[in-house]
């Protein structure tokens, strides 16, 4: 039996698409190999948000070809969509596919051998329909990613993703419901709604008022699903109507990854973000008032072109003031073809590093404060895996990692836990 291995970089959308492509291979008789193991086919599902992700893809390609010189190396995803010629020029690569037509990957792999090179990348801007590649199987997991949307039309000045993913395309609501019902019947308890710009769901559907809230309401009625979670979302989503609605639905997790990028209005303007810090804070306050247990996490970019010490200080003070549960800190990485890449006053690497370290320290402090508020309180935790001798790891409804000890296997269960201690990036608790 032939083996296929996947190496996945980037966002939850990529994770979903990898699972879907793996299922296509398995239907054709392939067996899954682990990422670093010997395989007949290696599929690299790329990300191109930063130079680092590009480099990781190239390193893996070369490493795996050494492991099996006769293997077929297929590269798909955002990096291959925006730079197909660059990837095809890598000696070890056989097949280059972009961010569309992934349903054909097995068919394309079967057409070639390790001596051939083929690119099927087309103009993503011409693609108008959502590509359906659903997941049907059960694989022993309890939390499923569910891709409901693709594409982005926001064109932030630093971001390459609109060029890699194309225009907004929404998945048919009936298709979403069908897949969630299937996941529920296979034992999944939590569904994470993902997309490139989830808040834009429905805007491309002609003669329809369907929005993301309609998707959530439909899933909320599906028996067997106990949790609904959203992946990264934009501030524009959180209208009074949306906040009021989700605050009354028990299945909707009180956690939102609310993209910020900068806590300075001048920087946000250069980034072409469509909100101010005042508007962002109002949304945070609105969520906290409606959902007292809510956890809000975010992304922040340091060292954006033109970011002065004064601008960074504004970001730091803003983040210190609003005390978000967790933040992912990124050092700005120029992406060819974006407006920010040619802006004046690019920030030097050492300054980016220093600013990143300062925010990471603040991140630890903010998480500790949030964790302290959870001490001696009880939370429902979805346990996903064993992480040591009699130790199991899971997530609370508000997306805080919890570790407990148990003599019994508690994987794939939702159990009540009392929080007893705050550690760096996670909490310790005891089963109630």
Each model region followed by its residue ranges:
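Aromatic/acidic polysaccharide-binding cleft in carbohydrate-active enzymes
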Residues: 331-345
């Amino acid at each position: 039996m032939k083996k296929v291995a996947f190496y996945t970089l980037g966002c939850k959308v990529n994770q979903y698409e990898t699972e879907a492509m793996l299922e296509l291979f398995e239907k054709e008789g392939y067996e899954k190999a682990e990422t670093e193991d010997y395989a007949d086919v290696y599929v690299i599902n790329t990300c191109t948000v930063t130079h680092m992700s590009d480099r990781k893809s190239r390193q893996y390609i070369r490493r795996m070809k050494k492991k099996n010189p006769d293997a077929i190396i297929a590269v798909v995803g955002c990096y291959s969509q925006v730079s197909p010629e660059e990837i095809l020029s890598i000696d070890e690569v056989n097949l280059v596919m972009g961010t569309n037509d992934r349903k054909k990957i097995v068919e394309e792999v079967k057409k070639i051998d390790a001596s051939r090179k083929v690119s099927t990348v087309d103009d993503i801007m011409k693609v108008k329909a959502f590509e359906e590649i659903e997941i049907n199987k059960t694989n022993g997991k309890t939390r499923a990613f569910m891709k409901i949307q693709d594409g982005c039309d926001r064109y932030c000045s630093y971001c390459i993703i609109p060029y890699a993913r194309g225009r907004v395309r929404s998945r048919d609501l009936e298709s979403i419901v069908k897949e969630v019902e299937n996941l529920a019947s296979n034992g999944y308890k939590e569904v994470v709604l993902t997309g490139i710009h989830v808040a834009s769901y429905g805007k491309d559907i002609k003669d329809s008022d369907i929005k993301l809230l309609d998707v959530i309401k439909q899933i909320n009625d599906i028996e067997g699903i106990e949790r609904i979670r959203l992946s990264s979302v934009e501030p524009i989503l959180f209208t009074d109507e949306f906040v009021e609605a989700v605050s009354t639905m028990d299945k909707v997790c009180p956690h939102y990854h609310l993209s910020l990028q900068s806590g300075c209005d001048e920087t946000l303007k250069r980034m072409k973000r469509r909100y101010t810090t005042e508007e962002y804070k109002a949304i945070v306050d609105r969520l906290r008032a409606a959902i007292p247990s809510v956890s809000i996490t975010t992304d922040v970019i340091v060292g954006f072109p033109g970011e002065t010490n004064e601008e960074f200080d504004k970001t730091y003070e803003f983040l210190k003031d609003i005390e978000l549960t967790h933040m992912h800190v990124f050092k700005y990485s120029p992406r060819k073809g974006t407006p920010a890449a040619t802006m004046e006053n690019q920030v030097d690497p050492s300054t980016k590093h220093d600013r990143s370290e300062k925010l990471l320290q603040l991140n630890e402090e903010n998480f500790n404060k949030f964790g302290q508020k959870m001490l001696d309180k009880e939370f429902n935790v979805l346990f996903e895996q064993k992480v040591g001798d009699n130790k199991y790891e899971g997530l609370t409804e508000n997306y805080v990692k919890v570790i407990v000890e148990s003599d019994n296997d508690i994987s794939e269960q939702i159990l009540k836990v009392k929080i007893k201690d705050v550690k760096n990036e996670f909490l310790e608790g005891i089963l109630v």
